[in-house]
């Protein structure tokens, strides 16, 4: 890390590999709701065998992806 004395055995989380089923369910939920209540996050976490934190972060990342995909084109460059 930035401080130079990071050793590999410290608790750096490994990347979560979601199953097709988990992604399908998360995408389905995102289609109806871009934001989750805590209760709904808990329900999804239990149903998909993931942690609340994983659900929360997946939704944060998915919202950023959605935002990038739906960005309005830059109108300054267009000439009449």
UniProtKB/Swiss-Prot annotation:
Residues 21-80 bind DNA. InterPro entries: Antp_homeobox_Deformed_sf, HD, HD_metazoa, Homeobox_CS, Homeodomain-like_sf. GO terms for cellular component: nucleoplasm. One of its GO terms (molecular function) is DNA-binding transcription factor activity, RNA polymerase II-specific. It comes from the Eukaryota. It is found in: Nucleus. Pfam families: Homeodomain. One of its GO terms (biological process) is positive regulation of transcription by RNA polymerase II. Keywords: Developmental protein, DNA-binding, Homeobox, Nucleus, Transcription, Transcription regulation. The keyword Iron-sulfur does not apply. SMART domains: HOX. Belongs to the Antp homeobox family. Deformed subfamily. Sequence-specific transcription factor which is part of a developmental regulatory system that provides cells with specific positional identities on the anterior-posterior axis. This is Homeobox protein Hox-A4. The gene is HOXA4.
